[in-house]
């Protein structure tokens, strides 16, 4: 293994999402939770390299779940930080920042309100820990709301934006009131980034660049 995965810097300060997401949550979420996924992913990759060198098939098989869980945690959080923006910044205005995506949403769901209601229902329907995503099929631009369990990443379609529904993403501030977290998250969604991912996905197919 020639290089290690690293924790990405946030594109804003830890208090930039207040009052929607507190500074305390952002610091713990980024410095502790995401860093742990990175550390464990690097350890799993090192074990994989060792197993490959020794041709230890049993060891290779045994570490696949660690690679999936921690690799998914790293991918999902790296996307999540980018699809959030400073509270009240221009990027959080859907109409101005994501006209193409807004048109596609209205075409498929009838209105933005219908879409946000549907997305919130999916998020609140997640049992245990997981993620809710708006994804694009690629060149067709077809949009879909999907969920992934635990830290499973989106594979196949292009993730336009995602919402972390693990308790560590909201509990210190919202306690067991998940509905308030889900309703408020729209105020810090980075629609400018979502528009970029949507347009990039409809113009070319390929692996998503973090």
Swiss-Prot record:
Its main location: mitochondrion. It is an enzyme of class 1 (oxidoreductase). The keyword tRNA-binding does not apply. Mn(2+) binds at residues 29, 77, 164, 168. InterPro entries: Fe/Mn_Superoxide_Dismutase (IPR050265), Mn/Fe_SOD (IPR001189), Mn/Fe_SOD_BS (IPR019833), Mn/Fe_SOD_C (IPR019832), Mn/Fe_SOD_N (IPR019831), Mn/Fe_SOD_N_sf (IPR036324), SOD_C_sf (IPR036314). Binds 1 Mn(2+) ion per subunit. Keywords: Manganese, Metal-binding, Mitochondrion, Oxidoreductase, Transit peptide. Its EC number is 1.15.1.1. PROSITE patterns: SOD_MN (PS00088). One of its GO terms (molecular function) is superoxide dismutase activity. It is found in: Mitochondrion matrix. GO terms for cellular component: mitochondrial matrix. Its cofactor is Mn(2+). It catalyses: 2 superoxide + 2 H(+) = H2O2 + O2. Homotetramer. Belongs to the iron/manganese superoxide dismutase family. Destroys superoxide anion radicals which are normally produced within the cells and which are toxic to biological systems. This is Superoxide dismutase [Mn], mitochondrial.
């Amino acid at each position: 293994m020639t290089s290690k995965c690293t924790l990405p810097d946030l594109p804003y300060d830890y208090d930039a999402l207040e009052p929607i997401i507190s500074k305390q949550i952002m610091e713990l979420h980024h410095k502790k939770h995401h860093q742990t996924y990175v550390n464990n992913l690097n350890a799993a990759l090192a074990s994989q390299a060792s197993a490959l060198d020794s041709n230890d098939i049993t060891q290779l098989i045994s570490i696949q779940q660690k690679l999936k869980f921690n690799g998914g945690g790293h991918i999902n959080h790296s996307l999540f930080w980018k699809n959030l923006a400073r509270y009240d910044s221009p990027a959080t205005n859907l109409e101005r920042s994501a006209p193409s995506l807004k048109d596609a949403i209205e075409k498929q769901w009838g209105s933005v309100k219908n879409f946000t209601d549907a997305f919130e229902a999916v998020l609140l329907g997640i049992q245990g820990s997981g993620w809710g995503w708006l994804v694009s099929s690629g060149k067709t631009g077809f949009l879909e709301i999907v969920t992934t369990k635990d830290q499973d990443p989106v594979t196949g379609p292009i993730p336009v934006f995602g919402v972390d529904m693990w308790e560590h993403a909201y509990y210190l501030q919202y306690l067991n009131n998940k509905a308030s977290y889900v309703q408020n998250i729209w105020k810090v969604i980075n629609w400018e980034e979502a528009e970029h991912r949507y347009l990039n996905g409809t113009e070319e197919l390929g692996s998503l660049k973090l």
